[in-house]
């Protein structure tokens, strides 16, 4: 379990100061945005959340102001400070009458079974686990059996990351619920990106959540842990709730610089709303299970299809940011066709020095020469980019600890006109196995804003430009390079 007392009090502050006098989210938007209500029926307002702080503030404010429902869907929900405080915020919402539904993929659940049961015991809260075949309620020998009896089922995961509030506002993007996705880890953080939405696209996001929630893949924790449930008393439920609330209310759990930052962020929500860009936008998603499952580890999906269609229409420029770069079958040839038509292709990805995934990097290392020979420009992120000073400008004590940064944002810009922000990595797993979500839209203002952000990430102070004569692998130890070499020997590319 990660450190329970890492600094991150944003959630607590906003919940504590906003709940008692909270308007509904819809009413607040009506009162603070003159023409938003009229636009929301047919258009979507969007704001790109580049910094972890503002993404967490947005989630916390919406959690504190929801009056009817909160639906969240995540791949990872850690038991660190962010994860625990978010859980406490959802419990507080349930206690004031909000219907709370949480859907989490099974493979990365690190909460204890008792904790899952205690949180789901509230009459207004429900927790379901997606594809529970490897972690929650699964014993060691059952895990072994599942791995060997149905390899695809073990590898088919729900990579979706969405949070929906009152059916009015939603957030999606690359961030999971853990400290490192919001720039609060003192050792290792992710350069990530989300997008805040209000309006029509949130209806599509809600429909996707309902489809997953009602699917055979989403199993209530009470069903998975039926035997343990019989041992949970009402007194234990009340005690766990008191512990969560007491932790959230105790200022000793939070670093001073975080409290100082909070005081300056509490007024940011209205300016954020005023900065939204309005247009027609599409929320793209996959069906539960990704596809019919009759093509082994292949088969594609709806997200894959729509992104390929968008890329195929490129005329001049494609700018991609993906932390993991392992081209699915036919991917390099597809990009070669675009390049032959005169399309410039640039890709921002992790270096060996920054990556959190040696297996995925080994797949990229095997393809790197072909990618460069095809004419693709590749930029590998530095572990200590100059940009981190901007990302952490309000947290000088974290800067002093010198944390590594790695890319985790999944974004795309086509011809400075079409953009995508979501969960899709440029690898076989996202193409064929994991369910993915994101926002795909044609809007020049947001596309240019996103392109400027990615282009900042690929500047020399933040990334290495990889060529046929140079790559930055020598920046790491021989031991780490050896791990890449060993992984390249394994037949694991379809699941990378």
What annotation goes with each model-predicted range?
Residues 1-4:
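Positively charged n-region of N-terminal signal peptides that target proteins for export
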Residues 18-161, 165-496:
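Charged, low-complexity intrinsically disordered terminal segments
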Residues 7-16:
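Bacterial N-terminal signal peptides
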């Amino acid at each position: 379990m990660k450190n329970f007392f890492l600094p991150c009090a944003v959630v607590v502050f906003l919940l504590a100061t906003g709940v008692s006098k909270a308007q509904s989210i819809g009413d607040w938007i009506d009162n603070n945005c003159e023409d938003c209500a009229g636009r929301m029926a047919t258009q979507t307002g969007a704001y790109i959340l580049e910094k972890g702080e503002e993404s967490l503030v947005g989630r916390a404010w919406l959690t504190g102001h929801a009056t009817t429902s909160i639906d969240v869907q995540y791949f990872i929900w850690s038991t660190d400070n962010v994860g625990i405080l978010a859980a406490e915020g959802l419990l507080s919402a349930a206690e004031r009458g909000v219907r709370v539904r949480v859907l989490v993929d099974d493979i990365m659940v690190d909460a204890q079974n008792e904790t899952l049961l205690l949180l789901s015991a509230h009459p207004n809260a429900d927790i379901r686990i997606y594809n529970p075949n490897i972690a929650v309620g699964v014993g060691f020998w059952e895990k072994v059996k599942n791995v060997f009896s149905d390899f695809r089922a073990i590898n088919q995961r729900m990579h979706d990351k969405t949070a929906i509030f009152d059916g009015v506002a939603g957030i999606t993007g690359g961030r999971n619920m853990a400290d490192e996705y919001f720039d609060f880890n003192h050792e290792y953080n992710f350069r990530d990106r989300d997008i805040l939405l209000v309006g029509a696209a949130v209806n599509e996001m809600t429909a996707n959540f309902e489809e997953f929630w009602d699917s055979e893949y989403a199993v209530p924790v009470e069903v998975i842990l039926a035997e343990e449930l019989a041992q949970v008393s009402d007194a234990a439920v009340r005690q766990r709730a008191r512990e969560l609330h007491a932790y959230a209310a105790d200022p000793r759990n939070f670093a001073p610089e975080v409290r100082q930052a909070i005081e300056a962020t509490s007024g940011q929500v209205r300016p954020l709303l005023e900065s939204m860009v309005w247009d027609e936008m599409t929320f793209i998603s996959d069906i539960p299970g990704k596809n019919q499952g009759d093509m082994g580890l292949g088969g594609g999906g709806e997200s894959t299809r729509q992104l390929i269609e968008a890329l195929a229409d490129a005329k001049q420029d494609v700018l991609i940011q993906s932390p993991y770069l392992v081209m699915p079958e036919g991917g390099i040839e597809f990009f070669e066709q675009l390049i032959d038509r005169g399309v410039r292709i640039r890709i921002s990805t992790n270096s060996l020095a920054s990556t959190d995934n040696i297996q995925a990097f080994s797949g990229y290392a095997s393809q790197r020469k072909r990618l460069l020979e095809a004419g693709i420009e590749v930029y590998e992120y530095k572990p200590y980019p100059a940009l981190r000073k901007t990302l952490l400008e309000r947290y000088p004590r974290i800067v002093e600890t010198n944390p590594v940064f790695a890319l985790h944002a999944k974004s795309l810009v086509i011809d400075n006109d079409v953009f995508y922000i979501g969960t899709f990595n440029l690898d076989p797993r996202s193409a064929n196995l994991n369910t993915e979500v994101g926002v795909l839209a044609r809007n020049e203002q947001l596309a240019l804003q996103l392109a400027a952000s990615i282009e900042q990430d690929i500047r020399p102070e933040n990334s290495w430009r990889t060529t046929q004569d140079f790559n930055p692998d020598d920046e790491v130890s021989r031991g780490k390079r050896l791990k890449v070499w060993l992984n390249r020997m394994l037949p694991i590319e379809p699941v990378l």
